Structure formats: C-alpha cells, structure tokens
Amino acid sequence: MRLLSFKKSKIVSIGTELEFQIIDCSSLSLVSRSKELMRALKDMRYRDQIKPEITQSMIEINSSIHQSAKEMYDELLELQKILVETAASIDIAFCGGGTHPFQQWTMQKIFPSKRFKKKFNQYRYLSKRATVFGQHIHIGCPTGDDAIYLTHALARYVPHFIAISASSPFYLGINTNYCSSRSTIFNAFPLSGVIPYLRNWQEFSDYYRKMYRWKIIENMKDFYWDIRPKPELGTIEIRVCDTPLTLRKSILITAYIQALALYLLEEKSVQLSHDLYYVYNYNRFQASRHGLEGELTVTDKDRPIPIMDDILETIKKIEQYINGLGNSEYIEELYSDVINKQNDSVLINKIYKQDGSFSKLVAAQCELWLSDSKDRKWMTQPS
C-alpha cells in the first residue's frame, strides 16, 4: 500500500493544547457555558485558537507552532488574557487541574457540534465521563519514520510525563489516592493505550488503511493512544499530561519533552522492541497512582528504580540539548520541583487539607491559574 502523506516539520518544533475548566463564580462548580463563551469570542483576536471540547464545561486553547518555549509562553499569556476579558462579561472563571474535585459527570452537556454529537452517539456515557482536562503536546518531526520512532521511544518516558504533570487527586467528590486520576479515565475507550508495535511509516500506513477500510476509524482522531502520530501536522502528540494549575508549569513540561525528543531523535538511544510495552501499563499505573514517588521498571535493569531518580538522571543526560534549545531556565525549575517531590497533585492536597473545602480548593485553583497574569479582578472569593 502507498504511504500516508506526512507533512514535514522542523525538528522538535512545538505546539500545545490546554483544556481548562469553566467555573461558576458563585458555586465554584463546573458550569456548561462554552456555547456562550464561544459566541462572546466570535470577533476576538485569536478566536480560531480557542475551541470548545466535547462537554460544555470545557474550553481549549491551542498555541501556534514554535521553536522556542519562551515564545510559546508569551502566546499562551495572550490567549489567557482574552479568556479573562471575555469571562468578565459573562460571569465565569477558569482553572487548571486534571479534574474538577466535586463535579458529577452525569450533569454534563454535550457541545452541539456535528462531530461531538456523533461521538456521544457512539460512546454514550463515556463521552460525559471524559469531562477531564489535559495538556496535549505536539513535537515536530521531519519524516513519518521519525514520528514512528519517537512515538515508541517516548513510551519509555510516559511515567515521567504523568508524574510531573499530575494534578487530579480528587474526582467525583472523593480523594482517589491517585496523583493523576484523570490518566485512568480514557482506558475504557477503544483504541486507547498504546500504538501497536509498528516499526516504520510504511507499516503504520498499511495499518491505518486497513482500519479505515474495516470502518473502525474515520481519521487519525479516532485513535486515543497516549502518544499518536499527527501526519497532517507533521507531529506526534503526547496526550497523557494533566492540565497544570499554571501556564508556566505547562511550559516546564513542554520544554522537558522538547529537549528529550531532540535527544532521542539525534542519538536514537532507545532501542525499539516489544519489551517497551511489556512493562508499559505497570509503569503507567505507578506514575498515575504514586506520581514522583512511584517506581519504574526498566527492561535493561534488574530492579525497579524511583521515577523521581530516573527523571533527574534523564535531565542530566540531555543537558546539552536543554541548553541548545534555550530551555535551561525552565528545566532548572522543573528539576527543583522533582527533587523536592513537588507536583500539582501535592499542592492540591495541601490546599484542601487547610480547610477541607472543595469550594475553597477550586477558588485557589482559579487564583493559581491567574498567577502568570496580573489581572485578578474577575474573581469573587467564596465566603
């Protein structure tokens, strides 16, 4: 079979998608207001980079393509400013975090687009249960073969990404005792988990065309893999991260993945084999459950190693690529977080323990979401 087209991208160019919670300013619960928000944004600058998600209490911002994490950060701040200005006119707020701590998925409303209606008819309750919030990171690849190699090679590091981004310890009003409860939600979807062990772009093209011919998929979006190729963009898309509490944290995560991807593409240090996936689900569970304090089974070692230690060693290993990309400032901050066992899940638990109030927790998350910005006038603190 002929090859699928793959749009050539600059090596490790970056883009990101961030899904945020739409919050009612009085009750601090999720509120289904994305239709109103999209109408209010109609004539705004960057309108095409702010999009609805499958349920109406979600909103997504998309960066454009960047080589520099700093430039991406500047753009995200501009997008945030537009959201804040628009929110003031319709009395809503936004926050990060992979889950809302006390929302009930049964109360969510599907956004009335043709695509989302079709997905709801196909997946029913799973669609509403997917009212969770993630950061997706795109990494540019020059060729389809590079994309397939990187998709597999980064699978070794998925526990890193889950652990450093974890921000969803509470779900449906309970403490799940997971650092990232969000990362368990999509397991029920078909075509979730990991890409099959396809070794090059030709094998992937053959697989894709068979799945299309069998009417299992219509396009690449029907694959819910943790990491998937995006040939129409010339990228791979990492989909395992919780939405961080701050825009800056999203940049730290992106900067780390960008440098790691460059290291892997340049040095081909991960040897692809089925062994990568023998341990994948267990390692993923360790990161979801325990975060930075989880353990990682590496196939060339005799015993598990702490995820935290593996991240710190990896940062040292890829230092020249971090420096070359100009990401040192962000990685130094990430290194400090990791060595001190700090992620957003730890912070959320700490805030909740102060008052035992989910409403005050959400209010704090809304404030943290604005910590990159000086504009805090929209929020009325709950009594």
Curated annotation (Swiss-Prot):
Catalytic activity: L-cysteine + L-glutamate + ATP = gamma-L-glutamyl-L-cysteine + ADP + phosphate + H(+)
InterPro entries for this protein: GCL_type2/YbdK_subfam, GCS2, Gln_synth/guanido_kin_cat_dom, YbdK
Keyword Ligase recorded: yes
Family matches, as Gene3D superfamilies: 3.30.590.20
SUPFAM superfamilies: Glutamine synthetase/guanido kinase (SSF55931)
One GO MF term attached to the UniProt entry: glutamate-cysteine ligase activity
GO BP term, example: modified amino acid biosynthetic process
E.C. numbers: 6.3.2.2
Keywords assigned by UniProt, alphabetized: ATP-binding, Ligase, Nucleotide-binding
Domain of life: Bacteria
EC main group: ligase
PANTHER family: GLUTAMATE--CYSTEINE LIGASE 2-RELATED
Family matches, as NCBIfam families: gshA_cyan_rel, PRK13516.1
Protein family per UniProt: Belongs to the glutamate--cysteine ligase type 2 family. YbdK subfamily.
Known role: ATP-dependent carboxylate-amine ligase which exhibits weak glutamate--cysteine ligase activity.
Protein name as catalogued: Putative glutamate--cysteine ligase 2
Organism whose genome encodes this protein: Legionella pneumophila subsp. pneumophila (strain Philadelphia 1 / ATCC 33152 / DSM 7513)
